[in-house]
Curated annotation (Swiss-Prot):
This is Uracil phosphoribosyltransferase. Binds 1 Mg(2+) ion per subunit. The magnesium is bound as Mg-PRPP. One of its GO terms (biological process) is uracil salvage. One of its GO terms (molecular function) is GTP binding. CDD domains: PRTases_typeI.
């Protein structure tokens, strides 16, 4: 992973496989089915990177040869929380990696002024649990900020929250960092800028529409 000196809490997963698959996702001619499969695959690969610092303890197990104290992840099961609707496509990849994880949902849509409007919150029990929030895009950053706000208002500590996205605009990352400098943001690409319609450039279009085969 690499970092950008402008954004201390931003981590960019620049693995060649991730970048290769992301290029195919950007292609406007990529089919809905392939887009969906690539999103799942990239998220799984990113999940490997973002979970590398999970707390570890040991468990006594019997191998065919000997008893040994072997490493296992400590604490409660992870919680994966997609930001609806496009985040659903990322939760599948994370569940492939951590099938025992709990799953919550935060439903947010963008109003005409690009501010988030919340319509759904369903979460597992919060105490002592690590949360991975996921949404393919961090454009204006407002939805990502709102999703973290939902957890913090329920007393989830910042150290137990991670946000993962495919692509982000610098404007959105700045908004996220200003609001939550204590929460790590993981992306596959920091793109150039937002256009006049608040779309990421070069981006990959509307992730939700491309994922579900709908039109905005």
């Amino acid at each position: 992973m690499k970092q950008d000196s402008r954004f201390p809490n931003l981590f960019i997963t620049d693995h060649p496989l991730i970048q290769h698959k992301l290029t195919h996702m950007r292609d406007k001619d990529t089919s809905t089915r392939t887009f969906r499969e690539l999103l799942r695959e990239i998220t799984l690969l990113m999940g490997y990177e973002i979970t590398r610092n999970l707390p570890i303890t040991t468990k006594r197990v019997e191998t065919p040869l000997v008893a040994v104290d072997a490493p296992v992840i400590a604490g409660k099961k992870l919680a994966i929380v997609p930001v609806l609707r496009a985040g659903i496509g990322m939760s599948d990849g994370l569940l492939d990696l951590v099938p025992s994880a709990r799953v919550g949902h935060i439903g947010v849509y963008r109003a005409d002024d690009h501010r988030p409007v919340e319509y759904l919150v369903r979460l597992p029990d919060l105490e002592d649990r690590i949360f991975i929030l996921c949404d393919p895009m961090v454009a204006t950053g407002y939805s990502a900020v709102h999703a973290v706000d939902v957890l913090k208002r329920r007393n989830v500590p910042a150290a137990n929250i991670m946000f993962v996205a495919l692509v982000a605009a610098p404007e959105g990352v700045q908004v996220f960092q200003d609001a939550h400098p204590d929460v790590k943001l993981f992306v596959a690409s920091l793109d150039s800028h937002l256009n006049e319609h608040a779309y990421i450039v070069p981006g990959l279009g509307d992730a939700g529409d491309r994922l579900f085969g709908t039109k905005n």
